[in-house]
Regions:
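Gly/Ala-rich beta-loop-alpha elbow adjacent to hydrolase catalytic centers
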Residues: 92-101
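Catalytic histidine neighborhood in serine/cysteine hydrolases
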Residues: 173-190
């Protein structure tokens, strides 16, 4: 499959390429390919990366407050990238990138219900809760309602401050098609072999579900 890759806030596509190096190396052996998109909004670097990596750094939409119209702008920016660089079979996002992917999938299903989803599968790593297209409210899980209907791999870290949001993102996904893996660490993509192999296993199972339909 060909994956669109969406980085977290205050980073960029090149940093996300490094963060996902371990899992990509194994996934590429199965023929999967990855394309990285930068967010649209210039941003300050994530605090833990300051002085370690070079910029520029980006957000997909405004962070730290209700993002308002910048959510729709992020949708447009992403769809334009898909039109120019796609098509993509799947999406993989980290933190804000995961939230953007989820929000875009939900928005697209609401506004274009008769069209197929933008992606056949999604991988959410340390995901934040997605925002409504208005950028005024986050999309909270509702009983027996699953707006993300494609196969998903939901990868979280128990020691991550965003762990509760990652669980809520998982609860937005169709349960029969949603895999859940806790790597047990902080807000990161672990590099150790055990977690790398388990994350790849979960992603490959998600891809297989998408292929089976």
């Amino acid at each position: 499959m060909r994956f669109l890759c969406l980085h977290g806030a205050g980073t960029n596509g090149e940093i996300f390429e490094i963060q996902t190096g371990g899992i990509r190396q194994l996934l590429q052996k199965s023929g999967h390919r990855f394309q990285f998109m930068n967010g649209k909004i210039n941003a300050k670097v994530q605090e833990e990366l300051e002085g370690i990596v070079d910029g520029p750094f980006y957000n997909h939409y405004t962070r730290g407050t209700s993002p308002g119209s910048t959510v729709l702008e992020a949708f447009d920016h992403t769809k334009q990238f898909i039109a120019e660089e796609g098509p993509f079979d799947a999406v993989i996002g980290f933190s804000q990138g995961a939230a953007l992917a989820a929000a875009l999938l939900i928005h697209q299903s609401k506004t274009h219900p008769d069209e197929p989803p933008l992606f056949r599968a999604a991988v959410f790593i340390c995901g934040a809760m997605p925002w409504e297209s208005s950028g005024l409210e986050q999309i909270a899980p509702q009983p027996d309602t699953y707006p993300i209907t494609i196969p998903t791999a939901n990868i979280v870290g128990k020691a991550d401050a965003l762990f509760p949001e990652g669980v809520k993102l998982f609860e937005l996904c169709e349960p029969t098609k949603a895999a859940f893996y806790d790597h047990g660490s902080k807000h990161m993509v672990p590099f150790d072999m055990k977690n790398t192999e388990e994350m790849v296993r979960v992603i490959e199972e998600t891809v297989a579900k998408a292929i089976r339909g």
